[in-house]
From Swiss-Prot:
Its cofactor is Zn(2+); Fe(3+). This is Imidazolonepropionase. Pathway: Amino-acid degradation; L-histidine degradation into L-glutamate; N-formimidoyl-L-glutamate from L-histidine: step 3/3. Keywords: Cytoplasm, Histidine metabolism, Hydrolase, Iron, Metal-binding, Zinc. The keyword Cytoplasm applies. It comes from Chelativorans sp. (strain BNC1). It is an enzyme of class 3 (hydrolase). Zn(2+) binds at residues 83, 85, 253, 328.
Length: 417
């Protein structure tokens, strides 16, 4: 995937060495977390030149180099939040109260709440207003070591507003030390004026909006919501056909509230990921594995809507599907801006292992964005995106609740305190 250069905090050009660290590299050619004791990382020009045991550090890399002693701290890849909706206006606190009174997510949506209720507040804001509203959410993610974040549109539901959201996402990348990947989510919900006319909405808004987003360089992937309260398999297929014709990768919200066959549809298009998946079946898992489609699990949404059906984690494991996790940060069903808490939720609610949680928030998150060649592991040739932690073992990142042990993080070779 082609990425724009980050200009808000340019890559650090000078060579630097981070030594005396305990590296959880997440390299796939190593077992478990890919741990390297007494490790060192050499960065130059925003890239990793060397990552491995300090004793194997080539002498020529040490000359004329800035050296930082990590004092035995743990180092992981920078975290990757691969599914968010952090650009929006307003909030949905009233719906939170409704859920406490017994209303379900589907009942709220059918009554005109849910996604559609965020549209008015979002449409009322300018690009600058959306950036201002999103910054506290993004800053909270960055404060926990996130160096890559995916941001979706989907609260505009008209062409200009969807493009405005994507412009805001691109703007965030220019003013914060983070890599932003954008997803066009025009097929998120049907606006009131198109109620009962999903096909017309796709023809008149979603598809031409996608063409414009692509022409203006605003979209890295195309997403959709395949669900009874949103869009059918056939309707999403129209969107994915357009994405394919434009050469844009796809992903899908699938099997969250029911099984419509969205995961199989996503797999048939070689989707980067299928997300949520509470109602995924074994056939869907096998299709995803065959296509290399990543399962993105979203425990924040599961928790917030008090869902009872859990994603079939064991079926995903048995099929060999890569598993990522993400905050799904959004105003209604996952008002969550902590990837660390997401790790704990993934373990506690979905019974993922510590290794799966950490991999899910680093390597597999990068895989779900088509960025594994760029980030997500600590190895030579990749972007120098690192998180440095004040912990005794990596398990603490998953085990602790309401705890941020980040010492510092590095984005494209530049230290961010």
């Amino acid at each position: 995937m082609t990425r724009n250069n980050f200009s808000g905090a340019a890559a650090h050009s000078a060579r630097s060495i981070w030594r005396n660290g305990r590296l959880a590299t997440l390299r796939e050619d190593l077992q478990g977390l890919g741990i390297v004791e007494n490790g060192a990382v050499v960065c130059e020009g925003g890239r990793i030149l060397f990552a491995g045991p300090e004793g194997e550090l080539p002498a020529e890399l040490i000359e004329n180099t800035e050296i930082t002693d990590l004092e035995g701290r743990w180092v992981t890849p920078g975290l990757v939040d691969c599914h968010t909706h952090i650009v929006y206006g307003g909030n949905r606190a009233r719906e939170f109260e409704m859920r406490l009174q017994g209303a379900t997510y589907e009942e709220i949506a059918r009554a005109g709440g849910g996604i559609v209720s965020s549209v008015k507040a979002t449409n009322a804001l300018s690009v600058e207003g959306l950036v201002e509203a999103a910054l506290p959410r993004l800053d909270t993610l960055i404060s926990e070591g996130v160096t890559t974040v995916e941001i979706k549109s989907g609260y505009g539901l008209n062409i200009e507003a969807e493009l405005k959201m994507l412009c805001a996402a691109r703007a965030l990348e220019q003013i914060r030390p983070v890599r932003v990947v954008t997803s066009y989510l025009g097929a998120h919900a049907t606006p009131v004026e198109y109620k009962g006319r999903n096909g017309d909405y796709i023809s008149e808004v979603v598809l031409p909006g996608l063409e414009r987003a692509h022409a203006e360089g605003l979209v890295d992937a195309v997403d959709g919501f395949c669900e009874g309260i949103a869009f059918s398999v056939d309707e999403i297929r129209r969107v994915f056909d357009k994405a394919r014709s434009l050469g844009i990768p796809v992903k899908l919200h699938a099997e969250q509230l029911s099984n419509l066959g969205g995961a199989k549809l996503a797999a048939s298009y070689g989707a980067l990921s299928a997300d949520h998946l509470e109602y995924l079946d074994e056939d869907g898992a096998r299709a995803m594995a065959a296509a290399g489609t990543v399962a993105v699990l979203l425990p924040g949404a599961f928790y917030a809507i008090n869902e009872k059906q859990k994603p079939p984690v064991e079926a995903l494991r048995q099929a060999g599907v890569h598993i990522a996790i993400a905050t799904d940060s959004n105003p209604g069903t996952s008002p969550l801006t902590s990837l660390l808490l997401t790790m704990n939720m993934s373990a506690t609610l979905f019974r993922l292992t510590v290794e799966e949680c950490i991999a899910g928030a680093t390597r597999e998150g990068a895989r779900a964005l088509g960025l594994l060649a760029e980030t997500g592991t600590i190895e030579a040739g990749k972007s120098a995106d690192l998180a440095i932690w004040n912990i005794e073992s990596p398990a603490e990142l998953v085990y602790r609740i309401g705890f941020n042990p980040l010492h510092a993080h590095i984005f494209k070779g530049r230290r961010i305190d």
